[in-house]
Amino acid sequence: MSSEAGKVIIKLPKTSIPYKYVEPTLIDVDKLVNHEELVEARLRELVDKIRSENAVDMPIIVTPIPGTDKFLIVDGHHRWAAVKALGYRKIPCVIIDYFSPEVKLKTWLPGIIGEVEPVLSEASRRGLKISMCNYDPNTLGEIDVKLLEESSFIVLGKNLCRAISGGIEGQKIVSQVLNELNMKGLFTLVYYGELSDALEDLKSGWLTYLFIRKILTKEDVMNYVKKGLVYAPKTTRHILPFYPAKTYTPLSKLA
């Protein structure tokens, strides 16, 4: 094994987003819609935490889904799922205006420190087409929009460019492959919040391969969840004007 099994690095720029107290609104868990698949280990961790604290430490962030009586979970998928798994009817929420310019939407960009061939081989085995492309970190701004739209990811490395087919649905397959091979210790998995940071590490050689994808719009997200669909974990990265301060809502209020 070339790296520590399950090692994941998160790389985000430093920010100064403030914490703000907002009186939470209790919303029925069945009125809430998640937009990303859940990670079972994280869900189990939060179930145990909520049970031991006998409270939900902080509200989740939600926004109305236009044309429905439901709310999109912007941040807090696993807390919502944990409360639901524990059998409670309501969860503390902070409702935001999703389309406010203060709420920004970006995407997580996966990268690996290690060999990419096992990822490409397994993605191909699971039905995705791998094709050659001619981009490098210095020509990234010139990538064809149509190619990004049709690809699940474009993989860049030193002297390598591969487009993986599948679009949004293909991203679920690739993300699953990345997680599975990472757990086997084949490589270290790195998630970047900003493309510029990822490219810097790729050019320096610290990062071996970078997976880039189309950046979603807020309209994309809303339309996708209205179809009853969910993205792969760590697809969307929402930047909010504030973090909700902890309120420790007792479970007794959620029955």
Swiss-Prot record:
Keyword terms of this UniProt record: ATP-binding, Kinase, Magnesium, Metal-binding, Nucleotide-binding, Transferase
One example GO MF annotation: metal ion binding
Recorded coiled-coil stretches: none
GO cellular component, one term: chromosome
GO biological process, one term: positive regulation of sporulation resulting in formation of a cellular spore
Gene3D superfamilies: Conserved hypothetical protein from pyrococcus furiosus pfu- 392566-001, domain 2, Conserved hypothetical protein from pyrococcus furiosus pfu- 392566-001, ParB domain
Active site (catalytic residues): 36
Function: Free serine kinase that uses ATP to phosphorylate L-serine to yield O-phospho-L-serine and ADP.
This protein's name: ATP-dependent L-serine kinase
Source lineage: Archaea, Thermoproteota, Thermoprotei, Desulfurococcales, Desulfurococcaceae
